[in-house]
Amino acid sequence: MKMKSIYFIAGLLLMIVQGSWQNPLQDTEEKSRSFKASQSEPLDESRQLNEVKRHSQGTFTSDYSKYLDSRRAQDFVQWLMSTKRNGQQGQEDKENDKFPDQLSSNAISKRHSEFERHAEGTYTSDITSYLEGQAAKEFIAWLVNGRGRRDFPEKALMAEEMGRRHADGTFTSDINKILDDMAAKEFLKWLINTKVTQRDLLGEYQ
């Protein structure tokens, strides 16, 4: 009985000692866990704060960049529109300034060309009439002097033959007059039917 009681007491003592050892160990483990948790919580919070800051900074930077890009685009579009308006206005002003000058220059050139045509036509008509009259007079005088019969060989030969056959001077004179009249008529007919220009007449009588 004594031995059993001793063993029983020894077992109780062992259980008490083990319980006393386990409680401090558990306390230390819990304290270490709580300490680790308390240290890890600020780290997690600071990490989350940093992530939130980075996210907010990135979002703000992105939004600000988009705003600046849109503002630059608007400024560029306004600059283009103002430049285009100024260019169109300047072009219209230049065209408006040139338009009266063009009208006046066209009117002056038109009047000048009409005056030149009128003067040239009048001068050509006058010089043509004068040269025709002079040519007719000179040609008739040339025929009367007997130097134009080469242009009409058949009629000239006939007149010469008739002059040789007939010694009568009156007949020969009448034939010469007839030939002169025929030559003058043919020359005038040639002048009428032929388009004689001022250059040809001036070149012929220079």
UniProtKB/Swiss-Prot annotation:
Modified positions (Arginine amide) in chain numbering: 147
UniProt keyword list: Amidation, Cleavage on pair of basic residues, Hormone, Secreted, Signal
Site entry (Cleavage), positions: 54-55, 85-86, 111-112, 117-118, 150-151, 165-166
Subcellular location, principal: secreted
Maturation-removed propeptide residues: 86-109, 151-163, 199-206
Region of interest called Disordered, as start-end residue ranges on this chain: 27-57
Description of post-translational modifications: Proglucagon is post-translationally processed in a tissue-specific manner in pancreatic A cells and intestinal L cells. In pancreatic A cells, the major bioactive hormone is glucagon cleaved by PCSK2/PC2. In the intestinal L cells PCSK1/PC1 liberates GLP-1 and GLP-2. GLP-1 is further N-terminally truncated by post-translational processing in the intestinal L cells resulting in GLP-1(7-37) GLP-1-(7-36)amide.
UniProt-listed Gene3D superfamilies: 6.10.250.590
GO molecular function: glucagon receptor binding; hormone activity; identical protein binding
Location(s), subcellular: Secreted
Record family assignment: Belongs to the glucagon family.
Protein name stated in the entry: Pro-glucagon
Organism whose genome encodes this protein: Gallus gallus (Chicken)
